[in-house]
C-alpha cells in the first residue's frame, strides 16, 4: 500500500517544499526483501565484563552474514570473530567515535550488580549518535526471574527501561529492543537476531523478547521461506491490511487460506488465486461459523496459524 504524502515528502521537490513550509517529513522505512542481506551495514558490538554470549553471537553472526566491529571495551571480540571467519575490526580510536554503523548490540548478560551499569552507559554514550537512520539497537540480558540474587535481578530488569528510553531518544526510525536469553538457550539466538536486525522488525520497538530452551521445534531450513509447509488462515483478506498480511504469509512460504465475508467474494477470489491459496467466503459472526470453520480446518488437515485481522465494519 502506497502513501502519497510519504513519497512526495521524500522526493527532491517535495523535500524542499516541506522544509520551507515547516511540514513534517516522515522517513521512508525499510521493507524486507529476500534478495537483500539481513543487515545492510556494520554492527557495533559491546558487552559488560563477564559477557556470556560472545561465542554464541559469533556463531549466529557467521550464519547470518553480519559484519561486525568491536567497541574498545570488548577487545576480545576481534580474535573470537576471526576464528569464525567474520569480517571485523575495532571501532573508534581511544575516545574518538568510529564510522557510522547500522546496528548496536550490547551483551548485558554479565551484569550482576547495578554498580556495573557504567559499562552499558559508556557503550551507548559513545555509540548512540553513530547509528544510521533506520538502524537497530539490541540489548541481550538474562531473565530477571532466573537470577541468583536480588541485585542481579534488579540490574537485569532495568534493561527494559533502558531499551524503551533508547527507542524514544534515538528516533530516525531506529528501533530498540531487549532480548532475555535463558540459560541453555544460547544456541537459539539466530532466529531472533535475524528478525530484529532485518527490515522485518521495522515497526517493532520497545519490546521484550524471551528466548527459552527449545521444546522440539526445528529452525527452518530456508530462512527466506520460514513458513514453508505451514497453513495460515487470514481473515479480512480480500483487501487492505488483510490482503497485505496474506501476501506476507505467502511470501514466507505459507499456504494461505483467505477468508472474508461473501460480499467480498470477487476480491477474495482474486487475491487467493494470485497467492496460490484458497478462498473461504463466510461471515465469522454467523451462528454456524464455528461449525463451518472447524469443517474447513479439518478438510485442510488443520491450520498452523490464524491471523484475525480486525477491520472496520462499513455499514
Question: Over which residues does each language-model region extend?
Answer:
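Hydrophobic Val/Ile/Leu positions in short beta-strands of Rossmann-like dinucleotide-binding domains
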Residues: 44-47, 234, 258
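Conserved glycine-rich Rossmann-like NAD(P)H-binding loop of the short-chain dehydrogenase/reductase
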Residues: 65-79, 254-269
Amino acid at each position: 500500500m502506497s502513501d502519497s504524502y510519504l513519497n512526495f515528502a521524500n522526493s527532491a521537490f517535495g523535500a524542499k517544499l516541506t522544509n520551507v513550509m515547516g511540514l513534517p517529513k516522515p522517513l521512508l522505512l525499510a521493507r524486507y526483501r529476500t534478495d537483500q542481506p539481513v543487515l545492510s551495514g556494520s554492527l557495533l558490538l559491546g558487552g559488560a565484563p563477564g559477557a556470556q554470549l560472545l561465542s554464541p553471537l559469533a556463531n549466529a553472526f557467521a550464519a547470518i552474514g553480519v559484519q561486525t566491529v568491536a567497541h574498545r571495551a570488548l577487545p576480545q571480540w576481534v580474535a573470537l570473530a576471526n576464528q569464525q571467519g567474520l569480517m571485523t575490526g575495532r571501532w573508534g580510536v581511544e575516545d574518538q567515535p568510529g564510522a557510522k554503523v547500522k546496528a548496536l548490540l550490547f551483551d548485558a548478560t554479565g551484569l550482576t550488580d547495578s554498580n556495573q551499569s557504567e559499562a552499558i552507559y559508556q557503550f551507548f554514550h559513545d555509540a548512540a549518535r553513530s547509528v544510521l537512520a533506520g538502524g537497530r539497537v539490541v540489548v541481550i540480558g538474562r531473565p530477571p526471574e532466573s537470577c541468583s540474587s536480588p541485585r542481579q535481578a534488579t540490574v537485569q530488569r532495568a534493561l527494559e527501561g533502558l531499551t524503551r528510553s533508547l527507542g524514544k531518544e534515538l528516533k530516525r526510525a531506529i528501533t530498540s529492543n531487549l532480548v532475555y536469553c535463558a540459560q541453555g538457550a544460547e544456541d537459539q539466538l539466530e532466529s531472533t537476531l535475524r528478525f530484529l536486525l532485518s527490515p522485518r522488525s521495522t515497526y517493532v520497538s520497545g519490546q521484550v523478547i524471551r528466548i527459552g530452551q527449545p521444546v522440539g521445534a526445528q529452525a527452518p531450513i530456508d530462512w527466506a521461506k520460514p513458513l514453508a509447509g505451514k497453513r495460515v488462515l487470514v481473515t479480512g483478506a480480500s483487501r487492505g491490511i488483510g490482503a497485505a498480511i496474506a501476501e506476507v504469509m505467502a511470501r514466507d512460504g505459507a499456504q494461505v487460506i483467505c477468508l472474508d465475508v461473501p460480499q467480498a467474494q470477487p476480491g477474495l477470489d482474486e487475491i487467493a488465486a494470485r497467492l496460490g491459496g484458497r478462498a473461504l467466503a463466510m461471515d465469522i459472526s454467523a451462528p454456524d461459523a464455528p461449525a463451518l470453520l472447524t469443517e474447513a480446518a479439518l478438510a485442510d488437515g488443520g491450520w498452523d496459524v490464524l491471523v484475525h485481522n480486525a477491520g472496520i465494519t462499513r455499514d
